[in-house]
C-alpha cells in the first residue's frame, strides 16, 4: 500500500525565481468578486487567499504558471496574465 501524496512537500522541491520588478499576473482593482472566489478554490498553488474581511489577497510568488487563473479570470478578475520574463518563474524539480 502506498502512502498518500503530500502536495506541500511536492511543491516544496520546486524553485521559484521571482521577478520583483515585473509581476506576471495583475489582479484588477475592480475584480469580479465571484470570479475571485472561484480562483481561491481553483489555484493549485493556493496563491489566492480569502481574508477575514472577505477580500481576496493574491501573491504571484510561487505561481506554477499553469494558466488556471488565466482561463477562469482574464478580463473579469485579472488585468494581466503573461509568462514571466526569461530566467524568472518556476523551475520544476521532480523529487
UniProtKB/Swiss-Prot annotation:
Q: Which UniProt keywords apply?
A: 4Fe-4S, Electron transport, Iron, Iron-sulfur, Metal-binding, Transport
Taxonomy, superkingdom: Bacteria
GO molecular function list: 4 iron, 4 sulfur cluster binding; iron ion binding
Q: Which PANTHER family match?
A: FERREDOXIN-LIKE, FERREDOXIN-LIKE PROTEIN FIXX-RELATED
Q: Main role?
A: Could be part of an electron transfer system required for anaerobic carnitine reduction. Could be a 3Fe-4S cluster-containing protein.
Which family does the UniProt entry place this protein in? Belongs to the bacterial-type ferredoxin family. FixX subfamily.
Q: Could you tell me what this protein is called?
A: Ferredoxin-like protein FixX
> What is the protein's species of origin?
Shigella flexneri
